UniProtKB/Swiss-Prot annotation:
The gene is tmem17-a. This is Transmembrane protein 17A. Transmembrane component of the tectonic-like complex, a complex localized at the transition zone of primary cilia and acting as a barrier that prevents diffusion of transmembrane proteins between the cilia and plasma membranes. Required for ciliogenesis and sonic hedgehog/SHH signaling. InterPro entries: Uncharacterised_TM-17. Signal peptide: none annotated. It is a multi-pass membrane protein. It comes from Xenopus tropicalis.
Length: 187
């Protein structure tokens, strides 16, 4: 029986090292008291700062984009007119959803919302912005390059920060799940 207790301690130590590495203070220590639903939420402050600035910058970007589109609309071929109007609508909807998912995922430490924020940023918003910046057929104006460049810079900074925040939230929730199993006697 003593040998089984030693094996159990070794396995417990191993699982703590695997699942609770880099979790730090966000996971409460095993104290014998039942784990309640109230736990410490650790949002990424740097991601929140960039989301805050992005939320204020986005209306300015939208107004500049509409003004620049109106100024050069007569100079563009028909297919570019269609593409730019569709891009304006798509990017506006995606950006609003992306910012909402970023705020709720980061502040409430919700992994699906934070993952959705990362996916929308990488798979949709970044390629659309790079198209607006790099396609010479759009005849970009200097103001247009500047506002698209700033929004792209925000996006390129937010992507790695959000990936780290997602990893941190996932580890935190995995640690809580592991602790719940320990406290219930199932693990």
């Amino acid at each position: 029986m003593a040998q089984a207790a030693g094996v159990r301690r070794q396995l417990d130590s191993l699982t703590r090292n695997i699942f609770l590495r880099d979790v730090g203070r966000t996971v409460p220590e095993k104290s014998g008291a039942p784990l309640t639903g109230d736990s410490e939420v650790a949002p990424s402050v740097s991601l929140q700062i960039f989301l805050y600035f992005n939320a204020f910058y986005f209306p300015f970007w939208w107004v500049c984009y509409v003004i620049m589109l109106q100024l050069k609309y007569v100079l563009l071929p028909d297919y570019y007119k269609f593409i730019l109007v569709v891009l304006l609508i798509l990017m506006s909807v995606i950006e609003v959803i992306r910012l909402y998912l970023g705020y709720s995922g980061n502040l409430q430490e919700k992994v699906p919302e934070l993952a959705g924020f990362c996916l929308l940023s990488i798979l949709l918003q970044l390629p659309l912005l790079l198209f607006l910046l790099c396609d010479p057929g759009l005849e970009p104006l200097p103001l247009e390059r500047a506002v698209h460049g700033i929004l792209t810079a925000f996006l390129l900074i937010q992507i790695p920060i959000s990936i780290f925040a997602l990893r941190k939230a996932t580890r935190h929730l995995a640690g809580r799940f592991h602790l719940l199993g320990d406290l219930d006697g199932r693990a």
